[in-house]
Regions:
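Preference for protein termini
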Residues: 1-132
Length: 132
């Protein structure tokens, strides 16, 4: 893995505003940082990133399967009771997800580890489609 430093787009703020990405800077700090990229070997991608990501996604789906079957778990996760049936019905119909983004930590020497998984969240539309 090799870290590559890049210049920020000179018109970043204007481009962000043009697509409604008004939170590119939050609390005086940049939320969106495009000054770093990473170059990987094929083995790193296949073995350390793609393989673990596939396994993690399967684990998340297993967890969701368990959660939607148990109203107490949905409540524990802060899901309003009024939404329980909607979520369970959507899951039972296998409605497709729009997108998902895994935030992984990877040191270049072993399998990536999951920090968080954002799927079908409003901000991800900007982060993974409109603004990239």
């Amino acid at each position: 893995m090799r870290k590559i430093t890049l210049p920020e787009r000179p018109d970043l703020a204007a481009k962000a505003a043009d697509v409604g990405f008004t939170f590119a800077h939050m609390h005086g700090e940049p939320y969106w940082d495009e000054t770093t990229a990473y170059q990987f070997t094929l083995a790193q991608i296949e073995d350390d990133l793609e393989g673990p990501a596939t396994e993690l996604h399967a684990m998340v789906r297993q967890a969701v399967d368990r959660i939607v079957a148990d109203p107490a778990l949905m409540t524990r996760l802060g899901i309003p009771q009024a939404h329980h049936a909607l979520i369970a019905d959507s899951w039972a119909r296998s409605e497709p997800a729009i997108y998902g983004r895994m935030d992984l930590v990877y040191d270049g020497t072993g399998p990536a580890k999951l920090l968080e998984y954002n799927a079908d969240t409003p901000t991800s539309l900007y982060e993974s489609a409109a603004f990239q």
